[in-house]
Amino acid sequence: MINIDELRSYSNIKIIGHRHADFDSMVSGYLLENIFLNLGIKAQFVLQDNEEDIFFKEKFIGRKRTWRKRSDDVLFLVDHTAEYDLPVVGCFDHHPEIAHIEKNYINEPKTSCAKVIYDWAQSIGYTVPNGYEVLTVYACYMDSLSFKSTKARPEDLEWCKEMMRKHNMDENEVVNFGYGLTPKTENFAQYIKTGVKTYPLGDKVIKSSYIVVDKDEEDENQIVATLSSEITKKTVAWCFIMSNVIAETTKILLVTQDYYLVQTVDKLLSRGKNIIPAVMTFLSAKNDGTITKMLIEKQLEIATMESCTSGLIASNITDYEGASAILKGSCITYSNETKILAGVRRGVIEEYGVYSPETASEMALTTKMKFMADIGIGITGSFGNIDPKNPDSVAGVIFYGINYSQEENPIKLVYTTPNMSRKDMKQKTVDIVLATLNAMLAQ
């Protein structure tokens, strides 16, 4: 229940969405500001961050508000229920968690927070202006399509269709916008740095950006070349994320000073909840026996099939006490023939090539099944000169797969540091593979 008379008694209400406000948070904030002002409530929507979605600002609002906190501020929250060191006088939300907000609190499981606010306005007889009605449609589609929200309700989407007819909205435009597709710009560097955020990693930082697309068409080499120039002593890595909302895949490209990694996952992942925590664990990992200890603690058995690393992954695992309890076995399959003898299907090698993500995946699955282990690691690639038996090989390009649980998405590793010795490259590869396993086990 919202007590309008009580809210009118405040002189400085700040309406705020969650940090790094998404589209729904911003629509909710601007919509509620419009309603409150017309009800005689002194309120202003402000952003907690210095960032605002450029497309949102240019297409719909054309203004930017950054919050400069004052001691006499009171807060009205939209699209979240975080705690603050200032009084909270109310909240609209649409998440399943019920917060301990004692008054002026409405939390309903609707497709978007903006729809919760819109429905409340209708219930008190307030007529929402056409422009904000349109924004609410966009907010509902953004949450329901782009992120496959579990909060999406069929009745809300039916309402959206009714509003689209009312306002003569182009359905294709609405749906495409609902997918959250990143608008192309002529400036490629600006395009792939959409949504830049910085994350602390000890005394260093990781930077990340993302784009949302409906088809994979971006040039990997161009992305790496652009982001490599951003790597410094302070910024140790850049995590670029490309979400394909049609194929429902997420491509992750992690660029560091010496190498970059590419992985495509067969589902849409959250940057904040899924990707960045794993990246931070990966970059923080040390080859100090942690993996062996984790496998022992979790009672997980592992097997490896190694080509270019020549058994060094298994060797590193057994450098630490207790490895006999978790390492089931290891195969060094340095040639195509030995891979086939070990159980890798000839057709996979012939169709995709021995140096490919498909072959790495096949190696991981094969060794896992052969040794009846919980985890299988497969690795293939070239550290040096072109392999005469495999002329398509590229020096410094490695593929590895880790078959664990029901999901396995192979990773491409490319070294970008010239003149790195074969020995150093081999050990670095082992460290990277074990760090990847560490991040998987830590989830």
Regions found by a protein language model. Name each.
Residues 284-443:
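Short alpha-helical segments enriched in small residues
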